[in-house]
């Protein structure tokens, strides 16, 4: 079987992010999306780390607080990766420009003469450079350039991830019992940012779909009361019911 689920709602969803240089030269990422198991905290921290030439350990993520966080349409499907992820990239680009402005003043040169490289701001054609920690200190004394940037993003398109699923079952024709022996899924979801998280997300979706098809059902008695009133009667699949489960990714550019 083949299925497709969009990455977001085009021309509707909005993702926002704030990236701030902390006192010790690390970064704070403030987002409006809540990590409900989508893995967005980890994935967006990875994006900051790549954009700012630092370790993921140097990025502290602060999740949704509607009183303080920048606006986000919410977490579902791949929206936080595709929409909020772009907002993170844009915020990092803004922050780099601002850090270069602060560093240029410290180095006594123009912003055109500096470059952000390997977590430092260097003066071109010289050995002079300043660290992020040094920039952070300068940011707090006699400075009019903020070491924080916010960006929002909305997309006119929604990339269509595809999945193909193939399953081998064992069927008892007398009782109707179905056993899952082997399930193989091949997923094209663009560029996989975090394969481990994407794999378990896919496995969870597969198990949920199998549960809806083969296990879960609600019936009612003659008085209209549900018979499956607890998990003692309402059967949900576990990993032991799944047999061999395999997930492979086919990367493509969105």
How does the language model describe each region?
Residues 26-31, 180-182:
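Short, aliphatic-rich beta-strand segments
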Residues 17, 27, 245:
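A broad, low-specificity signal marking well-ordered, structured residues that form hydrophobic/aromatic
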Residues 1-7, 46-254:
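C-terminal catalytic domains of large/alpha subunits in multi-subunit enzymes
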Residues 43:
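Flexible, small-/acidic-enriched active-site or ligand-binding loops
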Residues 24-27, 79-80:
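A short alpha-helix capping/helix-coil boundary motif
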Residues 23-24, 118:
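Residue-level signal for tight coil/turn positions that link beta-strands
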Residues 39-40, 94:
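Residue-level recognition of alpha-helix initiation/capping sites
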Residues 1-23, 31-33, 38:
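Conserved beta-alpha junction segments in alpha/beta enzyme cores
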């Amino acid at each position: 079987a083949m299925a497709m689920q969009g990455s977001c709602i085009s021309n509707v969803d909005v993702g926002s992010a704030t990236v701030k240089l902390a006192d010790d030269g690390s970064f704070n990422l403030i987002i409006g999306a809540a990590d409900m198991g989508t893995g967005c905290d980890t994935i967006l921290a990875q994006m900051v780390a790549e954009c700012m030439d630092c370790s993921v350990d140097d990025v502290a993520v602060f999740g949704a607080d509607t009183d303080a966080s920048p606006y986000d349409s919410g977490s579902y499907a791949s929206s936080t990766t595709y929409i909020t992820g772009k907002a993170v990239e844009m915020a990092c680009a803004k922050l780099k420009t601002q850090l270069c402005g602060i560093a240029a003043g410290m180095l006594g040169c123009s912003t055109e003469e500096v470059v952000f490289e390997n977590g430092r701001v260097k003066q071109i054609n010289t050995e002079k450079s300043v660290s992020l920690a040094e920039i952070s200190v300068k940011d707090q004394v006699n400075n009019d350039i903020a070491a924080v940037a916010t960006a929002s993003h909305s997309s006119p398109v929604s990339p269509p991830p595809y999945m193909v699923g193939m399953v081998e079952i064992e069927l008892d024709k007398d009782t109707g019992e179905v056993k899952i022996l082997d399930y193989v899924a091949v997923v094209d979801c663009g560029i996989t940012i975090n394969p481990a998280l994407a794999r378990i997300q896919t496995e969870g979706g597969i198990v949920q779909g199998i549960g809806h098809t083969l296990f879960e059902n609600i019936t009612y008695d003659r008085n209209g009361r549900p018979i499956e009133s607890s998990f003692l009667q309402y059967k949900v699949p576990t990993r032991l019911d799944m047999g061999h489960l395999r997930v492979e990714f086919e990367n493509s550019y969105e």
